[in-house]
Every structure is written in C-alpha cells, then in structure tokens.
Amino acid sequence: MISKPDKNKLRQKRHRRVRGKLSGTADRPRLNIFRSNTGIYAQVIDDVAGVTLASASTLDKEVSKGTKTEQAIVVGKLVAERAVAKGISEVVFDRGGYLYHGRVKALADSARENGLKF
C-alpha cells in the first residue's frame, strides 16, 4: 500500500532547495517565515554575519487577538516597522517552503504595505 507523504518533510525539502539559491546580506537581508499550527514567526536575517536583525511573531503582546490570518497581517506590519526602524528597506523573501497563499501571503502583503520592498 502507498503511504501518504509527510507534508512537513516535503516542505523542508522545498525549503532546503530554495535556500541553496537564496541568502541574505547586510544590504539586503532575508525575511524568513515559519508557520506553525498556532502561530506565525518572521525574522529579518543577515546570513553573512549570522545575525537576526528584526523579528516578530504571534507571541508578541501586540498580536494576541483575531484569526490566524489577521495575526499574520499584524506580524507582517510589526516586522516591517522594526526593520525600517533599523534602516532596512529591501529584503529577500524566504517563504520557508510554504505555498505563497493564505497566512504567508497576508504577512508578505502587510510587510510590503509597511515599507519593505521585495
């Protein structure tokens, strides 16, 4: 009998494949997304120095209410504001192997509206 594929392993495989071609620099850091069942996390990362420059997640106090998609919109707004405050305006978007749809798209659109270019 054919077993069902593990969705998370397939996502990790996609993410590894994309990360081979994609990296963040000090001039244009990487906006990384991680999506769990209960929350969404976003980090702006300089891969050359190995440093997180800005981050936001549903664990922040400002993001406690609403649906998961509404929370993703607030997380996108927060991470964009924190990155712009540190002088970062352009990033490389790393969707983490997730489809560009739903919460990931909502976060990306919100980050774009609040000053990040990608």
Curated annotation (Swiss-Prot):
Q: Tell me where on the tree of life, at the top rank, the source sits.
A: Bacteria
Region entry Disordered, spans: 1-22
Work out whether the entry's keyword set contains Chaperone.
no
Q: Which residues form a coiled coil?
A: none
What molecular function terms (GO) are annotated for this protein?
Answer: 5S rRNA binding; structural constituent of ribosome
Entry GO CC = cytosolic large ribosomal subunit
Q: What does the similarity note say?
A: Belongs to the universal ribosomal protein uL18 family.
What PANTHER family does the record point to? 39S RIBOSOMAL PROTEIN L18, MITOCHONDRIAL, LARGE RIBOSOMAL SUBUNIT PROTEIN UL18M
Q: What is known about its subunit structure?
A: Part of the 50S ribosomal subunit; part of the 5S rRNA/L5/L18/L25 subcomplex. Contacts the 5S and 23S rRNAs.
User: What is the role of this chain?
Assistant: This is one of the proteins that bind and probably mediate the attachment of the 5S RNA into the large ribosomal subunit, where it forms part of the central protuberance.
Q: What is this protein's name?
A: Large ribosomal subunit protein uL18
